[in-house]
Amino acid sequence: MNELRRLTITEMHDGLRRRNFSAVELVETHINAVENEQLNAFITKTPEIAIKAAKIADEHFLKQKDDIPPLMGIPVGVKDLFCTKGIKTTACSKMLENFIPTYESTVSNLLLKSGAAVLGKLNMDEFAMGSANTNSYFGPVENVWIRKSDGAKVVPGGSSGGSAASVAGFLCAGALGSDTGGSVRQPAAYCGVVGIKPTYGRCSRFGMIAFASSLDQAGVITRSVSDSALMLEIICGYDEKDSTSSKRTVPKFSSFINGDIKGKRIGIPKEYKMDGISDEIVHNWEKVSSNLKENGAEVVDITLPHTKYAIPVYYLICSAETSSNLARYDGVRYGFRVDADTLEEMYSLTRAEGFGKEVKRRILIGSYALSSGHYNEYYEKAQCIRALIRNDFIKAFEKIDYILVPSAPTEAFGLNEKPDPLIMCINDVFTVPASLAGLPAISVPVGLSNAGLPLALQVIGNYYDEAGILNMASVIEQNCGRIVNSLT
């Protein structure tokens, strides 16, 4: 492999600034890798856009070496949930197979304005619904990691599986993803990379195809914590086009990564020590907790009593919002259409053929939960319990600074294994609570399992404390070391 692809964003930027290599060289190396990739991570490739950005970057680096945006000339990918003007945006669904937006999402536009070289659009679970990236209309994504015990291919996680696999496979230096119930953090954990979901409202949702509007949030996946800080600085900020975006000033997150965690109180919730979590993850959880103590932090036990209700609450709320958000796909205004004799028949056939199995399952659940006879019993009750979950976190953060939990209960499972939907739901058990509360959280690799697959922990912070969780994650990263796949 060309060594340029193994560099982090920080190292790439430094090399460009020193003129050790050109942006065109850097981007062309990645374009070649994307053209020959075997992971099915990229579904739309935009080499001409990437090369154009690289040429502009080289002109800037020739004129000046300082005060150049950290992503200028850096090869990145964009999850196919974000609308990209003039470039096919499908949400990996047959329903939007040929949809070409006439506008750019705010977060992808911020990447373009920063000078990043966008290599293309990344595979994902259809409409971001899934935890394995096996629900894509364009086929599953493969994880770059292989299970040593039997040589089996494993899933990359989801729904941002293409984003995580492309970064882990050195196809791009960083990737834009989305996180509704763990869709950045869980695939980052499975692929051995860093994934951060900021506070709900930190990033604009304008131009991001809606799944569950009260939960959806853009996030980033990179190979190091410092790289995540750099990307997050670019995509965060107020947007008048999104009424839920925050007007809070966005700090320079990278400047807060100093490794100083002395006196910080880290909570370990007893409710997360549940059945089904692997012994290897428990071991790493305990080891990292001890390491953080050695670095001056205080580790204490806490309780989040309503966590046990998080999964059913999440699936009721997100399915209800899915039912509402996806009602617009009827074959009339845009997207896939089945010709029929009557309007009602066209609606029915279009949605039956245009949506995949998992999407239809969630629409049915959501429609049932919102129906007049069940609204109070299911949806309204779920919202009440969501408030209790949020209040548990608020109360906990009165006495602690951060929460340390696993990112997933197990390592990645086999690509050809078919766990039932209930198992897939439980897979999100550690990421969903922070999403329901709207809190920032970051997944960071902590080692490998006996089968040679990545394991990860998650740091959850208080509202708008992305800087704090990035610094805490950097200490974990320093203690555990970054993991790199030798097969790539």
Swiss-Prot record:
Enzyme's top EC category: ligase
Keywords: ATP-binding, Ligase, Nucleotide-binding, Protein biosynthesis
This enzyme's EC code(s): 6.3.5.7
Superkingdom of origin organism: Bacteria
GO molecular function: ATP binding; glutaminyl-tRNA synthase (glutamine-hydrolyzing) activity
Gene Ontology, cellular component aspect: glutamyl-tRNA(Gln) amidotransferase complex
Family, per entry: Belongs to the amidase family. GatA subfamily.
The protein's role, per its UniProt record: Allows the formation of correctly charged Gln-tRNA(Gln) through the transamidation of misacylated Glu-tRNA(Gln) in organisms which lack glutaminyl-tRNA synthetase. The reaction takes place in the presence of glutamine and ATP through an activated gamma-phospho-Glu-tRNA(Gln).
GO biological process: translation
UniProt-recorded name of the protein: Glutamyl-tRNA(Gln) amidotransferase subunit A
Species assigned in the record: Wolbachia pipientis subsp. Culex pipiens (strain wPip)
Residues forming the catalytic site: K79, S159, S183
PROSITE patterns on file: AMIDASES
Known partners and oligomeric status: Heterotrimer of A, B and C subunits.
Lineage: Bacteria, Pseudomonadati, Pseudomonadota, Alphaproteobacteria, Rickettsiales
Recorded catalytic activity of this chain's protein: L-glutamyl-tRNA(Gln) + L-glutamine + ATP + H2O = L-glutaminyl-tRNA(Gln) + L-glutamate + ADP + phosphate + H(+)
